[in-house]
């Protein structure tokens, strides 16, 4: 990490700030941080910097998660956390094995990320198709209006298994599971603050559980922890400042922004 320049440090701090804002209520923005960290570390360390960026980012994620859970501590819906968590952890173990298998084979890791991006965009398209059909039925049956938002959609348990497993692999390979969990929680129809609080608590637990796996892979070292430690301040600052912006965004704009970043993240995984 001695090869990091002032420009590298500035970009890493900017990425940490953006990640904090993502955790604090500006959904999807953290996907930009994943790209920033990977590009900066690749420039500083060469090809080995790409996998190292995953380990460098994890403590920063956890610091932002801690700040976000403090802000939204009363808004988490543990029913959905407990539904997603087991499969997220199972997917994390699978991702650990895959990461270990593909270390030194970046082309094959890229192919797996492409597959995740295709699945993510496919699920997004499916959601919009279902929403269009639901709206059509609501127009035909006015008395049914509003009923669909009161209870979780049918098959939500099965969706939790699918989304959790995919998310676990994605978070281990690239710290890129945010859109997967956000897609699931959005389909469940959670209100804005419950959405953010549930997501924050879920990823705090999952990210802490990832620590021993990343140490085993050699992508978290004492040197990387020192660098990550300096990035805690911008990350936590972003998480604390984000709610001030969230309060000024209505639910429709909020959800539109989520979908935009989910689609953007899907294309980023593919290309």
Where do the protein language model's features map onto the residues?
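Hydrophobic alpha-helical transmembrane segments of multi-pass integral membrane proteins
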Residues: 190, 194-214, 224-226
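Transmembrane alpha-helices of multi-pass small-molecule transport proteins
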Residues: 52-71
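Anionic-ligand binding region
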Residues: 157-172, 178-192
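Transmembrane helix boundary and interhelical junction motifs in multipass membrane proteins
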Residues: 25-34, 173-182
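Juxtamembrane transmembrane-helix boundary motif
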Residues: 1-21, 35-50, 71-167, 221-271
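Membrane-interface alpha-helices at helix entry/exit sites of multi-pass transporters
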Residues: 45-57, 80, 189-201
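Generic transmembrane alpha-helix signature in multi-pass membrane proteins
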Residues: 34, 66-73, 180-185, 210-220
């Amino acid at each position: 990490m001695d090869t990091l320049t002032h420009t590298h440090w500035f970009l890493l701090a900017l990425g940490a700030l953006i990640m904090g804002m993502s955790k604090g209520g500006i959904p999807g923005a953290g996907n930009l941080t994943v790209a920033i960290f990977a590009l900066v570390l690749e420039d500083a360390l060469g090809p080995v910097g790409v996998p190292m960026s995953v380990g460098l980012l994890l403590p920063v994620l956890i610091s932002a998660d801690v700040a976000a859970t403090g802000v939204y501590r009363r808004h988490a819906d543990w029913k959905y956390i407990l539904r997603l968590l087991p499969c997220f952890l199972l997917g994390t173990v699978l991702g650990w094995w895959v990461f270990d298998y593909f270390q030194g084979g970046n082309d094959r890791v890229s192919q797996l990320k492409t597959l995740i991006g295709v699945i993510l965009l496919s699920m997004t398209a499916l959601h919009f198709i279902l929403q269009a059909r639901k709206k059509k039925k609501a127009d035909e049956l006015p008395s049914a209006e509003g009923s669909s938002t009161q209870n979780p959609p049918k098959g939500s348990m099965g969706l939790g298994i699918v989304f959790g497993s995919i998310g676990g692999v994605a978070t281990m390979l690239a710290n890129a599971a945010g859109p997967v969990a956000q897609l699931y929680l959005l389909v469940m129809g959670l209100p804005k603050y419950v959405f953010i609080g549930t997501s924050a608590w879920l990823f705090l637990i999952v990210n802490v559980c990832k620590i021993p796996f990343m140490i085993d892979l050699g992508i978290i070292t004492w040197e990387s922890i020192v660098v990550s430690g300096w990035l805690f301040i911008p990350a936590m600052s972003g998480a604390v400042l984000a709610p001030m912006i969230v309060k000024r965004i209505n639910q429709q704009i909020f959800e539109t922004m989520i979908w935009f970043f989910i689609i953007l993240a899907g294309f980023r995984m593919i290309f």
